[in-house]
Amino acid sequence: MGRDTIADIITSIRNADMGTKGMVRIASTNITENIVKILLREGFIENVRKHRESNKYFLVSTLRHRRNRKGTYRNILKRISRPGLRIYSNYQGIPRILGGMGVVILSTSRGIMTDREARLEGIGGEILCYIW
């Protein structure tokens, strides 16, 4: 039985978002690095740095904070395709979250990308998660 690293990322970010923590430490793999880069580019997290600790690499990401208020923005992250039930979609069937305000992260033959990038390139893939 393997680990679901994508679900681990989502759970870590969600737990840190609910609490008062502003930072999340995630084990670094190629998939996690690509997903965190997308989250950084889309503005869901503020900062990411790579940290080495006893021959293992971790990504330390800072969550985005509200101005003039305590706490972070409440982002909703939902895992869609999971190891027991894979969900695939062609580029025409990729769902739009909140009319395009949310982000769908896909795993395609050209790497991990957002729904907008996949529609522009005209490729579909496995729907990993929704973020809004």
Curated annotation (Swiss-Prot):
Signal peptide range in chain numbering: none
A GO BP entry: translation
Any one GO cellular component localisation term in the record: ribosome
MF (Gene Ontology): rRNA binding; structural constituent of ribosome
SUPFAM superfamilies reported in the protein's UniProt record: Ribosomal protein S8 (SSF56047)
Transmembrane stretches, start-end: none
Keyword Plastid: yes
PROSITE patterns in UniProt: RIBOSOMAL_S8
Protein localization: Plastid, Chloroplast
UniProtKB keywords: Chloroplast, Plastid, Ribonucleoprotein, Ribosomal protein, RNA-binding, rRNA-binding
Gene3D superfamilies the UniProt entry points to: 3.30.1370.30, 3.30.1490.10
Coarse class of the protein's main subcellular location: plastid
Cross-referenced InterPro entries: Ribosomal_uS8, Ribosomal_uS8_CS, Ribosomal_uS8_sf
Role this protein plays: One of the primary rRNA binding proteins, it binds directly to 16S rRNA central domain where it helps coordinate assembly of the platform of the 30S subunit.
Record's subunit section: Part of the 30S ribosomal subunit.
PANTHER family, per database record: 40S RIBOSOMAL PROTEIN S15A (PTHR11758)
Entry's family note: Belongs to the universal ribosomal protein uS8 family.
Protein name, as recorded: Small ribosomal subunit protein uS8c
